[in-house]
């Protein structure tokens, strides 16, 4: 086994995590190689043809702010965009786009091929080579060794993949591609704990065989949206989605065939995603419901293939055909692909550091579904952080760690490395403690400076960001210092809005704080700036109106940061701390949190246990101070 080539960073996998990892490392100047089992499958969207949505849209915006690629490519290839929860507060509003999955995958491949310092390799990686506790490289199925100072594993659902359709099972990755064989055994030999999860996908139908007149049309928003503030606003023609529903006949058919459903026959052993259940699971769990929503989503401008969201299933193909035809509008639908379930191996995520480096092997990082997550956006976010930190490892630089108070990416990774997950992890807005501070509309304000610090934000992006940031600050200052009195044009607008008239002078900031007053009303009064960029005035309006809530969250953040500042020695013997509960000793010894804050979030570690740890850390600090004085 000879050395073929030496790289700084090797990325295994070219899905959504692998793409971001490879681009991040290469853009930071690392000699990078990205391995995939087939070059034709780079950036494949093997499940739903969409990006974004609640919490997921936040992740996409944060990836963009840090200098990642997903947002830019989504903006370039979308079929439809909608702002979800637009009638609710800004904390839960989220952008969701239907994506042309063919165009998206091709665009991502072009980005990779045109990136300096990045080689693409079609090969099956079977072994991780480790020497003296450090990663040394990888070996392919054909016996070729490639050296590397850091390796990122982003294998998706390919590790020992097994697809199931009714009674038919076969070793396979998603979409019928070859599974990754051998890598799981390599990880186990290195001492990693490996688990098994399951996910699934619905059938696809030929749109020419669907009667859309029996469905409810759902169009994109007429006003243009974008994930990246670097993308132009695009008024392209959008394609509609369609809403229909299952029927009592659908449910009866499923019940009659439960004895053939792998979910209920014991064929499927892996735990599936809670928030994306199969249709047979929904029928059993919600037996009183007469129907469930079904959405038909276009997959590409170049294809008639439609994704049947809501009918994820692993029932036999002949049952799937019959099932689809019980849904209004699809009585004569032709299946182009059957739905299937897929089982795959993953690494138990508590074996990772917050940097996504493994605790067992230095220089080995993991990102994406290999860490037990679900979703393109979750994968891309982890891949980006893993790629940045693989490069930092090579440079000998401190890793980038996003805290829970800085981004949804921080919440995602902290949950994984601190708590783990007994099922495929999905990002939800409810998982974030500081939702008013972590809005999707301020992701660039929160994280672009970090992206610049770590070398992924170029001069063009930085210039646009600085203009936005400075524009927001300048307008906030103007609103705070400008006083307006009860002028007739002001009183007229306030009366029309049903707002109390002014009796004395107030600042524009105080006026904008009124629930019924919007920034455009200030413009109408002659007090706003009609030429101001919409992104600036919208952010200013949000900051002013929610200042009280944001201030309360900031107090919580300050308390959390004090806890995060208390570092725990990596060699601390928890078994020797007699004040800890037995469960806390076991969990702390296994997870080995890096800070007191992380320790406090571990399931089974009580406030009393945290107090014991705090006392011990204080004792260690005093002993260290005395030693230094001596």
Swiss-Prot record:
Cellular localisation: Cytoplasm
GO cellular-component term (any): cytosol
Keyword Methyltransferase: no
Gene3D superfamilies documented for this protein: FAD/NAD(P)-binding domain, GidA associated domain, C-terminal subdomain, tRNA uridine 5-carboxymethylaminomethyl modification enzyme MnmG/GidA
Keyword Transmembrane helix: no
One Pfam family of this chain: GIDA_C_1st
Role played: NAD-binding protein involved in the addition of a carboxymethylaminomethyl (cmnm) group at the wobble position (U34) of certain tRNAs, forming tRNA-cmnm(5)s(2)U34.
Subunit structure: Homodimer. Heterotetramer of two MnmE and two MnmG subunits.
Protein's name according to its UniProt entry: tRNA uridine 5-carboxymethylaminomethyl modification enzyme MnmG
Organism: Symbiobacterium thermophilum (strain DSM 24528 / JCM 14929 / IAM 14863 / T)
Encoding gene, per UniProt annotation: mnmG
């Amino acid at each position: 086994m000879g050395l073929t080539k030496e790289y700084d960073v090797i990325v295994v996998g070219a899905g959504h995590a692998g793409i971001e990892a490879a681009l991040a490392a290469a853009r930071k100047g690392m000699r990078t190689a990205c391995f995939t089992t087939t070059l034709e499958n780079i950036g494949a969207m093997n499940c739903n043809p969409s990006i974004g949505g609640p919490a997921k849209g936040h992740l996409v915006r944060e990836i963009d702010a840090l200098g990642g690629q997903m947002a830019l490519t989504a903006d370039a290839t979308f079929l439809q965009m909608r702002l979800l929860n637009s009638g609710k507060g800004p904390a839960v509003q989220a952008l969701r786009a239907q994506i042309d999955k063919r165009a998206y995958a091709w665009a991502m491949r072009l980005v990779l091929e045109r990136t300096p310092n990045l080689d693409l390799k079609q090969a099956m990686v079977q072994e991780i080579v480790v020497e003296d506790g450090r990663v040394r490289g990888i070996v392919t199925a054909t016996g070729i060794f490639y050296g590397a100072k850091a390796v990122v594993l982003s294998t998706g659902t390919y590790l020992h993949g097994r697809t199931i359709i009714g009674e038919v099972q076969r070793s396979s990755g998603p979409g019928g591609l070859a599974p990754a064989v051998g890598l799981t055994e390599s990880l186990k030999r290195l001492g990693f704990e490996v688990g098994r999860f399951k996910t699934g996908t619905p059938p696809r139908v030929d749109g020419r065989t669907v009667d859309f007149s029996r469905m409810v049309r759902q169009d994109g928003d007429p006003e243009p949206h974008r994930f990246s503030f670097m993308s132009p606003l695009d008024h392209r023609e959008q394609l509609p989605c369609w809403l229909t529903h299952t029927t009592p006949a659908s449910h009866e058919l499923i019940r009659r065939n439960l004895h053939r459903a792998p979910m209920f026959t014991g064929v499927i052993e892996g735990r599936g995603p809670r928030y994306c259940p199969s249709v047979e699971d929904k029928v059993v769990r919600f037996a009183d419901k007469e129907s469930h929503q079904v959405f038909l989503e276009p997959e590409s401008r170049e294809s008639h293939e439609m994704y049947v969201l809501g009918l994820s299933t692993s029932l036999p193909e002949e049952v799937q055909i019959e099932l689809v035809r019980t849904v209004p509008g699809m009585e004569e639908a032709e299946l182009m692909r059957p739905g299937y379930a897929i089982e795959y191996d993953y690494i138990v995520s508590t074996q990772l550091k917050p940097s996504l480096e493994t605790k067992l092997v230095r220089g080995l990082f993991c990102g994406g579904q290999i860490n037990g997550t679900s979703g393109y956006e979750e994968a891309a976010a982890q891949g980006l952080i893993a790629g940045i930190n693989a490069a930092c490892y090579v440079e000998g630089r401190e890793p980038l760690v996003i805290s829970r108070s800085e981004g949804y990416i921080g919440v995602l990774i902290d949950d994984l490395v601190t708590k783990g997950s007994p099922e495929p992890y999905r990002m939800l807005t409810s998982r974030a403690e500081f939702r008013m501070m972590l809005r999707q509309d301020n992701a660039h304000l929160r994280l672009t400076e970090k992206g610049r610090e770590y070398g992924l934000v170029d001069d063009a992006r930085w210039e646009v960001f600085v203009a936005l940031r400075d524009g927001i600050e300048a307008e906030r200052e103007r609103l705070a210092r400008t006083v307006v009195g009860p002028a007739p044009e002001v009183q007229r607008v306030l009366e029309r809005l049903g707002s109390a008239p002014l009796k004395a002078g107030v600042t524009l900031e105080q006026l904008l704080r009124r629930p019924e007053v919007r920034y455009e009303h200030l413009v109408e009064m002659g007090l706003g700036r009609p030429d101001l960029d919409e992104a600036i005035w919208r952010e200013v309006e949000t900051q002013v109106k929610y200042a009280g809530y944001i201030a309360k969250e900031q107090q919580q953040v300050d308390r959390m940061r004090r806890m995060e500042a208390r570092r725990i020695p990596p060699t601390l013997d928890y078994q020797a701390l007699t004040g800890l509960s037995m469960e806390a000793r076991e969990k702390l010894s296994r997870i080995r949190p890096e800070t007191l804050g992380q320790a406090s979030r571990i399931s089974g570690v009580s406030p009393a246990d945290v107090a014991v740890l705090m006392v011990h850390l204080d004792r260690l600090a005093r002993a260290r101070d005395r030693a230094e004085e001596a």
